[in-house]
Amino acid sequence: SIFAIGYRSDQVANVKIGYGTLIPDSKYPISGILHESDIHQSKRCPENYRLFRLMVPHNRWNGNEESVLSCAENLLAGNPEKFVKIGEREIPRYKPGYMRKIAQMNTDCTYIGWSVSGVSITHVIDEAERIAEQF
């Protein structure tokens, strides 16, 4: 599952600006924290706020959203301004060589989307921003 959690910037001043954090320890329900408002050029949250995306694999938590919130508060800061489950997704999987095959295609058009730029939401958003800048 994917959660969004937002804070006033002063609440998370101790969290370094950056891409995010991987959490390999399976005792935590959160496997990764993406610093959404730090890594994207487009506005992700109001000024003086920071937005984080929490990646929560189903095999690492009991389905109780409070356990995710508690973990996030321990890792980031307490009392977030916003905490919401935004979806349940599975990362698409491709056979080895798929991206190389796509890169070698000769076409008269430009392809966009996760099937050609990468499967992470960050790749998709970066690609969308790149295309938007061309207009």
Descriptions of predicted regions:
Residues 64-111:
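Flavin (FAD/FMN) cofactor-binding core of flavoprotein oxidoreductases
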Residues 21-27, 43, 95-98, 120, ...:
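Solvent-exposed, flexible loop/coil residues
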Residues 40, 59-61, 89-92, 116-118:
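Short Gly/Pro-enriched loop/turn and capping motifs at secondary-structure junctions
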Residues 53, 102-132:
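Short FAD-binding loop at a beta-strand-to-alpha-helix junction that anchors the flavin cofactor
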Residues 1-66:
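Mid-domain catalytic core of redox enzymes
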Residues 32, 67-71, 127-130:
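Alpha-helical elements of Rossmann-like donor-binding domains used by nucleotide-donor carbohydrate transfer enzymes
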Residues 74-75, 130-135:
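C-terminal alpha-helix
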